[in-house]
């Protein structure tokens, strides 16, 4: 009798994020990311964060899902609150009321790790840039927990004026990500146009 070889899954080289029940593929059509769970320019949302009003925050997620969002951005960063604790609460509770994939949006690496540890799926991570210290922090987390990472064309020198300067940062991002075992398909470039 001949030996049958195992069939391994084929890597289709697509950028995909997921919750525990839904997935979103990038690159085929526009992806609608709901950005109402973010305090930037939102007075009521800032108040909800300050008052620990989790039902208000969850309602923002539910409403965005009802209006067609495919991914929910989660940013709870305000200087006067404990971002780590709030990120933990919001990510945990959102997953109980919606099955949309989440975008973890924070500049705090501790809050990001807490969210990634709790997340049930493959998240969108917002964001990394070309600064060496930031790449190290974020790519270590992506390597450990998985995810697709939004990558910004900015580094220690700021945002380059030329396309060539931005391309150089993109190349540095891809090279550094590869050193951490992160595939190019798990990087989405934001050129900051």
What are these regions (language model features)?
Residues 1-191:
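Domain-level signal for soluble alpha/beta catalytic cores
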């Amino acid at each position: 009798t001949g030996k049958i070889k195992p069939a391994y899954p084929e890597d289709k080289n697509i950028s995909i994020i997921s919750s525990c029940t839904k997935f979103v593929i990038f690159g085929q059509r526009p992806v609608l990311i709901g950005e109402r769970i973010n305090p930037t320019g939102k007075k009521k949302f800032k108040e909800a964060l300050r008052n620990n009003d989790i039902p208000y925050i969850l309602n923002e997620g539910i409403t965005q899902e009802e209006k067609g969002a495919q991914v929910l951005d989660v940013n709870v960063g305000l200087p006067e609150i404990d971002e780590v604790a709030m990120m933990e609460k919001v990510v945990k509770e959102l997953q109980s009321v919606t099955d949309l994939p989440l975008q973890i949006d924070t500049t705090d690496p501790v809050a990001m790790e807490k969210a990634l540890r709790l997340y049930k799926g493959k998240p969108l991570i917002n964001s990394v840039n070309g600064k060496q210290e930031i790449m190290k922090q974020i790519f270590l987390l992506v390597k450990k927990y998985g995810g697709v990472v939004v990558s910004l064309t900015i580094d220690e020198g700021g945002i380059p004026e030329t396309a060539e300067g931005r391309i150089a940062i993109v190349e540095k991002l891809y090279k550094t990500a590869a050193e951490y075992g992160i595939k190019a398909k798990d990087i989405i470039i934001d050129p900051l146009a």
